[in-house]
């Protein structure tokens, strides 16, 4: 074509003679890519870029149109080359980034190549697609293509099922370094101060796993690992090599642990891990052979590193490196099965850390995550794990807590049910069957069935394909001469005020633990009906307690009928492991929220276990108290404060603001949760004043506060802070050169209670000398009192926020703004939210689901307050 065509996602009418319908969602399979050859000229610091792409294709059926994806690319010319001829093609742009490449006559079946020359723009705002950032005076260029933004870098078949080799050449300034998925083959000088960097042909990859990075990087050698001695490197912005020491030390251990589990060598020729100065809406990306991380996750100055930061870093690294097998070597066929990537990586991360660092007790963190997933899953508007993708916006919505956290919890349940060895054989079989190819849920379940020697897939599917959490009612009847019988009844757990139906049936693998003399015994059954009984094996004596969720691994809530909750609390709790105890406490909180347990029993349980030695148990009780605090009227806040002081005050003061030599990791992790609870809600003047003193000292001396407590101290100081302190925080925000410090300062800025200061903090989002992408958490206030301030700001600046702040995964930023109102609790507020967003969210991909969940949360809060507040008041009155 002689003129450029800007592909901006606008809808153009097809010529009247066209016989080919525009795809509604997925590309047709008449033409499939076989290989990509990409040639890009990338100049960090300059927005325009030039590209050529040759796509070798297999034309399976005669067609006059080849459908591909492109977004914001200027197509300059398109030709189709067959073994016998070369044909010029026209490019027609359609909605949803679809482009029809049209030939004058139908293309015959067989091999051919599409040759496209084009231009595009490198974004300075987004952190997906091709984007660039200036850091310490240098420009760096990166890519992040999952799920649907490879099409902003090159025209391509941008769906995960199209998995092919890629051969990439980059033309970049001669003084810069360039990286991609495959090893570099050569560098050749070119005119104009450029060089051509050629990379080896990659293994078969979908477009979303292709990766590029260009800039004045430093490279840290992390050694070699695994059976094949894979070279490992950490790629960092210039001058930050020392901050990669921990990541470099941990990488070989993680790779080798994963190789042992999978019984498959690391699949790629190298593993680079690249630090990106700033990311929004993502923390890391599992590009094959070249993982990208937000620098705050991967890098830390050695003198500021702590166990808390190391836990976060190693956990994310294990997640991303496990993707090299689960997601990259075997790739989901379509986005409805993204759980096969993300849920497995989340589960494997915990499993690997249990092997590498058993002292971290990440199995308990997994139990906490399971409860978090159930709290999200209580909504009728919640997605299913394997949610059908019906419109493009559903793709981005699939990357949520249901996919990651519920998915990993369900995997953990079936591993516990089948046994770790059987489950591992199923995983290994799945990888062996589908290496370098695509797979879906049915493929994984077939491998699991083979390994188990029985039908597991139908059980697993009942959790994949329907939303919600099972609620299992349990009772036991004991006869004088017969074995005890357990009575189970299942329904969907719903919170108070929900308009959903409880009539859901799962196929639940239930592993029950019961008393057996002074020990405990396990028995597993499969519950497939609404009501089901089974006999306790091996004993005719009535148990002194039963517990329905061995290891806390089951993805279900439990309600103990009759005397069995009291018996469990009195007789069973001392014999249970911490995961099981944690599950009972979390179920207690959920039953209270569901109106199935009174305030005295629920809050009394939290007080009883507030002094537990394990931080996870303590944090679970804090969660119950915090939920009650949301419903406590102002006149009873002093009572709540005295309860908090009596339950947690002594421990908070004992921990204090200064870590002690030789203290446990649990103490370090508990301190940031306990200190603000007691200092603020517990009205502990001494703790609050010390936190304020330390925060003020930190503004002058960054060594004055333990690194793990900086955000806590700044938030406490801001709680009753004045304009003078606010202005000091803003001044330091502008002065600081370290992203981690700026994030800590923002945690303070969102904690002011003065509405005028809260408003001033929000207005920083439009300050031209600040990075707005670092300030988005200001839209999720720490305080109930300032939620209306945020809401008014969102209503007044909706369009400006959408224009100023980057979206992610093809979803505009404004699609997330309904979530800023999720903490509201009255009918009037709900109506205001619905009225404001009506007509707005329908136009934004992904927006309607966020609005639905927010409206449902507000409605539930209305009902919960009316039903539970009297019981909470009654419980608090004696304090």
Task: Report the location of each language-model feature.
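Surface-exposed beta-strand/loop patches in extracellular or lumenal glycoproteins
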Residues: 54-72, 167-173, 489-511
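Glycine/proline-rich low-complexity spacer/linker segments in large multi-domain proteins
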Residues: 25-28, 108, 117-167, 215-222, ...
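Hydrophobic helix-coil surface modules that form long, contiguous segments used
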Residues: 51, 143-148, 155-318, 347-350, ...
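Long, ordered, helix-rich scaffold segments
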Residues: 370-371, 401, 487, 500, ...
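N-terminal, polar/Ser/Thr-rich
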Residues: 17-50, 136-139, 160, 457
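Hydrophobic alpha-helical and helix-loop surface patches within well-folded domains
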Residues: 75, 199, 227-499, 627, ...
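Beta-strand-rich binding/interaction modules
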Residues: 75-81, 456-457, 467-549
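A surface-exposed beta-strand-loop module
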Residues: 72-135, 191-193, 531-541
